[in-house]
């Protein structure tokens, strides 16, 4: 501690003041009587007070006189460029080292490090951080930029290496801004998990109190973080999960790939971290199975792969009568749309619909050259469209439907395809086809997006054969009342049973019965007991898959499967 010489001055009113010991070379003596400027008399008493020395935290950022930022360290950090370190003496006599972060010119052509995407943001922001290979590769890119770039710049270069604390465990090398964050990270190496869940039969342990608090909410069901969007009612266990969700509304992608020429951006740093490994070639997760040794860029892909060896399939379809199991959640999600007949994602360029955003994004990239289309961007766009559609639906009245009935007659001796009625409901001129059993029980509704209009072909699938009923597609041909006949065509092209179509109000002409076909199809599984299930055909979907899906749906009982305009 440092001593300062002060003198106390007792004023005439009894109050005490402190006077610095030396005033312009003069010395005030103990007990001396002095007269102050306001005319009052004071007595001098000398005392000693202690001034606490100012201590710096290791790695603390400080602002220098020239306005630049530096970092204080008690000892030189391993791996730092000696030319970027400056030894200084603190007031308490100790020596510290100031680290001046390296600046990268913004016009660099090897590696562009944006202001909000410095290398320090790339290292271990979440549970999984970058491995040492990735960090080294990025630093090599940055150092090459410094070596090849001119020394002079406009002073607005981006700081690299702000993370002052590097993990010393072999093969790790992850970087952190504070000693506390490094200490928390090191628990992943030591296995220290002192925060344990108290719920019965759980006993999970965590490295941080925040991790435990978030986990406990899986037991309590608490979701305190609610989406602020007016039309969205979702809530989340953690603020981080809420922040990621909000970006689906705003379209924000704050985490950009730092590699020049890539330009991709992501909603979370973890997704970006995995993406960067496609540039560096790092695959930190290796399959331990003998004779396998496959490497993966993410822990999720690694875990899914390991289940191939173990045979574990933890994700089960909950649809009654199905019970299929999958090794990964994404496969279960994709499987579920088979039961819902849902293709909610529509291409804005050509109108094709898809079940997954990943398939739509791949279609946009290959068919329309939209290289920036990704699974996340299409999901965000879809959710925004859903919100707009919900808002518009509240303002517009429901249209009144009109009906056109189609009756198909099949020979009684043919038990494979029982008699059925297909009814077309026109709402605002848009036809909607419903398949109805002989006893009048409606089984499924098919939207205009599923059929593309009346011109779509309906495949009637049985356990023994597949036939196609062609319905004319041009609405101007629905002109006069009457009865007309079209022909059902088998899979090999052979004409089979004639089908009579009875229309009311609007008609189909006989000579155009096979005039128009559209690329989309709906498969109808017909059984001897009169049960009908319609299944939307996907590209390259096999007949076996169609029968499997429809059979599973029929096991649920005779229920009405209503669909929206996009089949959901």
Swiss-Prot record:
Which BP terms from GO are recorded?
positive regulation of transcription by RNA polymerase II; regulation of transcription by RNA polymerase II
Q: Which PROSITE patterns match?
A: ZINC_FINGER_C2H2_1, ZINC_FINGER_C2H2_2
Domain of life from the UniProt record: Eukaryota
The location annotated for the cross-link Glycyl lysine isopeptide (Lys-Gly) (interchain with G-Cter in SUMO2) is 24
Q: Which residues form a coiled coil?
A: none
Record's GO cellular component, any one?
nucleus
Q: Does the keyword Metal-binding apply?
A: yes
Localization per record: Nucleus
**SMART domains named in the record:** ZnF_C2H2
Zn-finger segments (C2H2-type): 165-189, 195-219, 225-249, 255-279, 285-309, 315-339, 345-368
Give GO terms: molecular function aspect only: DNA-binding transcription activator activity, RNA polymerase II-specific; DNA-binding transcription factor activity, RNA polymerase II-specific; RNA polymerase II cis-regulatory region sequence-specific DNA binding; sequence-specific DNA binding; sequence-specific double-stranded DNA binding; zinc ion binding
Start and end residues of the sequence repeats are 34-45, 62-73, 88-99
Q: Which PANTHER family match?
A: KRUEPPEL-LIKE TRANSCRIPTION FACTOR
Q: What does this protein do?
A: May be involved in transcriptional regulation.
- Please report which protein family the annotation says this sequence is part of: Belongs to the krueppel C2H2-type zinc-finger protein family.
Write the protein's name: Zinc finger protein 76
Query: From which source organism is this entry?
Result: Rattus norvegicus (Rat)
């Amino acid at each position: 501690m440092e001593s300062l010489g002060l003198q106390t001055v007792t004023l005439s009113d009894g109050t005490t003041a402190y006077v610095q010991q030396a005033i312009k070379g003069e010395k005030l003596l103990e007990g001396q009587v002095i007269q102050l400027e306001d005319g009052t008399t004071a007595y001098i008493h000398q005392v000693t007070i202690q001034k606490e020395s100012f201590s710096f935290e290791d790695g603390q950022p400080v602002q220098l006189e020239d306005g630049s930022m530096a970092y204080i360290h008690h000892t030189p950090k391993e791996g730092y460029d000696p030319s970027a370190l400056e030894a200084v003496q603190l007031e308490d006599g100790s020596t510290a080292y100031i680290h001046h972060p390296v600046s990268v010119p913004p016009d660099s052509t090897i590696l562009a490090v944006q202001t909000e995407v410095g290398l320090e943001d790339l290292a271990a922001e979440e549970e999984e951080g970058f491995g040492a290979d990735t960090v080294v590769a990025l630093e090599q890119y940055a150092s090459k930029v410094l070596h090849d770039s001119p020394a002079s710049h406009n002073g607005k270069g981006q700081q690299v290496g702000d993370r002052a604390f590097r993990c010393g465990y072999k093969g790790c090398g992850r970087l952190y801004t504070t000693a506390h964050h490094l200490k928390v990270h090191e628990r992943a190496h030591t296995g220290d998990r002192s925060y344990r869940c108290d719920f019965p039969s759980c006993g999970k342990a965590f490295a941080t109190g925040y991790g435990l608090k978030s986990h406990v909410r899986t037991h309590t069901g608490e979701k305190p973080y609610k989406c602020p969007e007016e039309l969205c009612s979702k809530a989340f266990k953690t603020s981080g999960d809420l922040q990621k969700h909000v970006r689906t509304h705003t379209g924000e992608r704050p985490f950009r790939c730092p590699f020049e020429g890539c330009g991709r951006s992501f909603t979370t740093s973890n997704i970006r971290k995995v993406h960067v490994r496609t540039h560096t070639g790092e695959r930190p997760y290796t399959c331990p199975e003998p004779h396998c040794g496959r490497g993966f860029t993410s822990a999720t892909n690694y875990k899914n792969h390991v289940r191939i060896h173990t045979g574990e399939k933890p994700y089960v379809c909950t649809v009654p009568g199905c019970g299929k199991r999958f090794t990964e959640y994404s496969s279960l999600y994709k499987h579920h749309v088979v039961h819902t007949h849902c293709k909610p994602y529509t291409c804005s360029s050509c109108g094709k619909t898809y079940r997954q955003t990943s398939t739509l994004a791949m279609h946009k990239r290959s068919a329309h050259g939209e290289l920036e289309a990704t699974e996340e961007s299409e999901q965000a766009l879809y959710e925004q469209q859903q919100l707009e559609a919900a808002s518009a639906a509240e303002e517009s009245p429901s249209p009144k439907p009109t009906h056109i009935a189609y009756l198909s007659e099949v020979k009684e001796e043919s038990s494979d395809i029982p008699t059925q009625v297909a009814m077309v409901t026109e709402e605002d001129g848009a036809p909607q086809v419903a398949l109805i059993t002989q006893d009048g029980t409606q089984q499924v509704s098919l939207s205009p997006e599923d059929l593309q209009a009346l011109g779509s072909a309906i495949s009637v699938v049985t356990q023994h054969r597949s036939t196609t009923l062609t319905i004319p597609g041009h609405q101007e041909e629905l002109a006069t009342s009457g009865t007309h006949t079209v022909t059902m065509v088998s899979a090999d092209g052979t004409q089979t049973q004639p089908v009579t179509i009875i229309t009311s109000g609007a008609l189909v002409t006989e000579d155009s019965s096979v005039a128009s076909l559209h690329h989309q199809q709906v498969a109808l599984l017909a059984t001897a007991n009169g049960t009908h299930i319609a299944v939307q055909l996907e590209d390259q979907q096999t007949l076996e898959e169609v029968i499997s899906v429809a059979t599973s749906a029929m096991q649920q009982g005779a229920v009405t499967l209503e669909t929206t305009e996009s089949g959901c």
